[in-house]
Amino acid sequence: MASADELTFHEFEEATNLLADTPDAATTSRSDQLTPQGHVAVAVGSGGSYGAEDEVEEESDKAALLQEQQQQQQPGFWTFSYYQSFFDVDTSQVLDRIKGSLLPRPGHNFVRHHLRNRPDLYGPFWICATLAFVLAVTGNLTLVLAQRRDPSIHYSPQFHKVTVAGISIYCYAWLVPLALWGFLRWRKGVQERMGPYTFLETVCIYGYSLFVFIPMVVLWLIPVPWLQWLFGALALGLSAAGLVFTLWPVVREDTRLVATVLLSVVVLLHALLAMGCKLYFFQSLPPENVAPPPQITSLPSNIALSPTLPQSLAPS
């Protein structure tokens, strides 16, 4: 048991002196310290609200500065850095888009399932370059093989076919999508429900659709005319089907006449490209014009030839 002296009230001189020196100091009792767990009392002075507002303003200033820096770092369309982003694709993405162009299916949109709002120029650029090179090389090889079968055919390397193939393929892969994109933009003003693809998406559609022509051109080395036309028809059907299935969601909101005419023109231009490649790069050269050997005729031995005298010695 505690003694009576221990239970009596004691004054502490240090506390008394402290209160005398600082009469405005806040005091707390022991009951205030015994607060339930999980409850924290926070005392905010008169300047606390201003500190919170300063932090919010500082964060907003940082966000605005970061956005301004990003806008300044974004290159213009006339710079090389702007177009560099369109070549930033990996091999798996390019192969997936090539596979999508080779296996068109109804209801399977190439733009939505393979491009995913990220068109690239890497695939279309190299597909067009490869197709132009393969066209020129196989066209010359066809003439070499024809000369080996028929020596009367005269062959000389035709390097101009590389230029013709490059200009034809790149003009088709860029000018036709440009005209199609412009027409769809114009039809968007007539039919407000239509949402055309962007120009780069249209170029990407046409560029990947030309990939199927590369193996077709290689198979044209087989010197069988009907087999060459069969391979051409199969490649044209796959490529044109991919274009129709991709463009149909855009043009179906328009009138039936406009949609039918537009898709027919797209298929017709594709067919003209395939036929032009077949007829120009794989035409057979005519045989070399060789002069016939002179024919020597012998006269019978019983026919005597009369000698001829010069005109000056002939009798008058």
UniProtKB/Swiss-Prot annotation:
Q: How does it assemble?
A: Interacts with YIPF6; this interaction may stabilize YIPF2. May also form a ternary complex with YIPF1 and YIPF6.
Give the start-end ranges of region Disordered.
16-37
List residues in topological domain: Lumenal: 146-163, 220-231, 278-316
- From which domain of life does this come? Eukaryota
Keywords carried by this UniProt record? Acetylation, Endosome, Golgi apparatus, Membrane, Transmembrane, Transmembrane helix
Q: Which family does the entry's similarity section mention?
A: Belongs to the YIP1 family.
Transmembrane annotation, as ranges: 125-145, 164-184, 197-219, 232-252, 257-277
Give yes or no: UniProt keyword Acetylation.
yes
Do you know which InterPro entries this protein is assigned to? Yip1_dom, Yip5/YIPF1/YIPF2
Record's GO cellular component terms? Golgi apparatus; Golgi medial cisterna; Golgi trans cisterna; late endosome membrane; trans-Golgi network; transport vesicle
GO molecular function, a single term: small GTPase binding
One GO biological-process annotation of the entry reads: vesicle-mediated transport
Amino acid composition bias (Polar residues), ranges on this chain: 25-36
Which cysteine-cysteine pairs are annotated as disulfide bonds in the entry?
Answer: none
Instruction: Note the topology in the membrane.
Output: Multi-pass membrane protein
Where this protein primarily resides, as one coarse class? Golgi
Q: Keyword Acetylation on this protein?
A: yes
The PTM N-acetylalanine maps to 2
Record topological domains on the Cytoplasmic side? 2-124, 185-196, 253-256
* Protein name (Swiss-Prot/TrEMBL): Protein YIPF2
Places the protein is found:
Golgi apparatus, cis-Golgi network membrane; Golgi apparatus, trans-Golgi network membrane; Late endosome membrane
